[in-house]
Amino acid sequence: MSRPTGPQFWPPFKPCPCGSGRSYAACCQPFHTGERDAPTPEALMRSRYAAYALADADYVRRTWHPDTVPAELDLNDGVKYTGLRIHRAEGDEVEFTASMKGPDGQPHNMRERSRFVQLDGRWVYLDAAE
């Protein structure tokens, strides 16, 4: 039996999965609940990473540009997100490495330079820069 996932199951007093060092309630939870929008591309990147870690596909889709969002998104694929390192956040781009363990338990790192745009006054993920 798998354990429940999603932001509603992450205690607000625990450290935020984005690795900021702050509690979830003081970091990404207000973005996940829709209480506030992420004010910067880096804050959005961190909140999206936390959403992946918590299997919150609704938030990931909600913060993805409608022209580039995939038709299907499965965050219950057995991947365990283990860390986020921001290398650079400048303008509308954030370069980061996401660490994870695959369903087979093997560690993986994904490095990406993400591009963000403002849509209707809020930041959304556009794509990975080439």
Curated annotation (Swiss-Prot):
Pfam families: SEC-C, YchJ_M-like. InterPro entries: NTF2-like_dom_sf, SEC_C_motif, UPF0225, YchJ-like_M. It comes from the Bacteria. Belongs to the UPF0225 family. This is UPF0225 protein DR_0483. It comes from Deinococcus radiodurans (strain ATCC 13939 / DSM 20539 / JCM 16871 / CCUG 27074 / LMG 4051 / NBRC 15346 / NCIMB 9279 / VKM B-1422 / R1).
